[in-house]
């Protein structure tokens, strides 16, 4: 059964290229576009995440994913783009040519849940 009201665990976007890409600037431009789409959806739904994941698929279909987690939610588009670009720079040698790029934000918290919820008080006699 499909549950349309399930709690979302991540927000992501990916793009498969018609031709393999080896130019890091083209990769970064596409990652910026993907991050912008993720950020737009994240802002619209008020779901903010603490883990950013970069996905790279090589021409031989090997998939490389690299993540970075933070103590607080990523809310700023420029920060999200910087993190994704940093992940690419750190792992470009592992996948210098790609046919697919992806950006995912996980460890989501709704805006009104970001403060950790309500602290319950226990009464002691």
Model-assigned labels for residue ranges:
Residues 1-98, 108-113, 117-119, 124:
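DNA-contacting surface of Y-family translesion DNA polymerases
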């Amino acid at each position: 059964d499909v549950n349309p009201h399930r709690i979302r665990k991540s927000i992501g976007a990916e793009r498969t290229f018609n031709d393999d890409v080896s130019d890091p600037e083209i990769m970064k431009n596409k990652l910026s576009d993907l991050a912008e789409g993720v950020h737009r959806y994240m802002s619209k739904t008020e779901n903010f995440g603490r883990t950013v994941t970069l996905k790279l698929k090589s021409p031989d279909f090997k998939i490389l994913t690299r993540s970075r987690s933070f103590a607080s939610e990523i809310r700023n588009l420029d920060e999200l783009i910087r993190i994704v670009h940093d992940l690419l720079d750190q792992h470009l040698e592992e996948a210098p040519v790609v046919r697919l790029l992806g950006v995912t934000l996980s460890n989501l918290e709704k805006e009104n849940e970001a403060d950790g919820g309500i602290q319950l008080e226990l009464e002691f006699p």
